[in-house]
Amino acid sequence: MKALSKLKAEEGIWMTDVPVPELGHNDLLIKIRKTAICGTDVHIYNWDEWSQKTIPVPMVVGHEYVGEVVGIGQEVKGFKIGDRVSGEGHITCGHCRNCRGGRTHLCRNTIGVGVNRPGCFAEYLVIPAFNAFKIPDNISDDLASIFDPFGNAVHTALSFDLVGEDVLVSGAGPIGIMAAAVAKHVGARNVVITDVNEYRLELARKMGITRAVNVAKENLNDVMTELGMTEGFDVGLEMSGAPPAFRTMLDTMNHGGRIAMLGIPPSDMSIDWTKVIFKGLFIKGIYGREMFETWYKMAALIQSGLDLSPIITHRFSIDDFQKGFDAMRSGQSGKVILSWD
């Protein structure tokens, strides 16, 4: 079958031919319809320090997808041939304390699809049936293919009560923009997103965010005054991993504020901890999606009118995958979809 693989320990991803994966007793075989390129895939393409330590070579990559069930393991129940599915990219062990306690998103033995084992940038994918999620008929293939990153946004945004709150989102990548849109959709008062990338800030404006702020040109405190805010942000969603953005968030949080962190900062990032202590801030780390509460919330948000369509900016045939990666690497894109049909 046709697949995109990391074939060499150097920059790039290559089209290759690999065997169709074998179906296990508890697995589903999925014929891929559409995939989306993640920031993680760009890291793998660039072959940065993290990728060099993490990614086995050669391996099929990719973990954002939608497809159709074409094979079912003999122990699997609840699925049928033809079901349209996406899937949770974190494969968990099932026997650690968190897995047995129903907190599978906190599994200490997580294996990543397209990171630690073969991924979805291929005509067919095999995953455990436990990880598959049926897509409702009224959700398009394009939107279903980005459920993985949308799930990161939903998990982060819904970590705290947002109704009537003022929310700061730092980082206007696709996940940050989707998190801001979720916050607005579920009843936040003011949702402010910050970045220095004007293309992506404009995408945020198209998504109906209260205010998209280029912090290289505008002062966040001035924006807060403009919005009539007098006590700081109630909730912070840190999506950038940029130390200056996190420091600004700490500066502008209200006392008792709550921060969810999805962005990965440098390991040696320094902050003024007195602001955390004396403001009584609560900081929560976010990794992946809650299984499968986040997935049900994703479907419900779209079905209740959340419009994510502006975040998908580029669509290519899989044979033009290089154009897709070029768009993602340029920073001048939202989500990029690759069609396998």
Swiss-Prot record:
Enzyme superclass (EC): oxidoreductase
Catalytic center residues: 40, 43
Residues annotated for NAD(+) binding in this entry: 175, 195, 200, 262-264, 286-287
GO biological process per UniProt: L-threonine catabolic process to glycine
List of residues binding Zn(2+) 1: 38, 63-64
GO molecular function, one term: zinc ion binding
Cofactor binding, per record: Binds 2 Zn(2+) ions per subunit.
Keywords assigned by UniProt, alphabetized: Cytoplasm, Metal-binding, NAD, Oxidoreductase, Zinc
A GO-annotated cellular component: cytoplasm
Catalysis performed (reactions): L-threonine + NAD(+) = (2S)-2-amino-3-oxobutanoate + NADH + H(+)
SUPFAM superfamilies found in the cross-reference section: GroES-like, NAD(P)-binding Rossmann-fold domains
Broad class of where this protein is predominantly found: cytoplasm
Membrane-crossing residue ranges in chain numbering: none
Locations listed in the record: Cytoplasm
UniProt-annotated binding residues for Zn(2+) 2: 93, 96, 99, 107
Cofactor(s) of this protein: Zn(2+)
PROSITE patterns per record: ADH_ZINC
Site feature: Important for catalytic activity for the proton relay mechanism but does not participate directly in the coordination of zinc atom: 148
Family statement: Belongs to the zinc-containing alcohol dehydrogenase family.
Functional note: Catalyzes the NAD(+)-dependent oxidation of L-threonine to 2-amino-3-ketobutyrate.
Assembly with partners or alone: Homotetramer.
Name assigned to this protein: L-threonine 3-dehydrogenase
Species classification: Bacteria, Pseudomonadati, Pseudomonadota, Gammaproteobacteria, Enterobacterales
